[in-house]
Amino acid sequence: MQVSVRDNNVEQALRALKKKLQREGVFREMKLKQHFEKPSVKRAREQAEAVRRARKLARKKAQREGAL
């Protein structure tokens, strides 16, 4: 990952880097990899996340259809 520093503004470059890392999911992955996660726990977590995503998508779709 690469961020250019313009006009010696390191703070702005750090913010841009943090935003890129956040978008890529690096922080979330690091948090998950801090400790070993049993395969059964991982599978359950991923299924719960999928259900959450599906509900969110359905909610957005219903809201969009209600607005039309």
Curated annotation (Swiss-Prot):
GO biological process: translation
Domain of life of the organism encoding this protein: Bacteria
Record keywords, A-Z: Ribonucleoprotein, Ribosomal protein
Entry keyword Ribosomal protein: yes
Cross-referenced InterPro entries: Ribosomal_bS21 (IPR001911), Ribosomal_bS21_CS (IPR018278), Ribosomal_bS21_sf (IPR038380)
Keyword Mitochondrion: no
One matching Pfam family: Ribosomal_S21
Family: Belongs to the bacterial ribosomal protein bS21 family.
Name of the protein: Small ribosomal subunit protein bS21
Gene giving rise to this polypeptide: rpsU
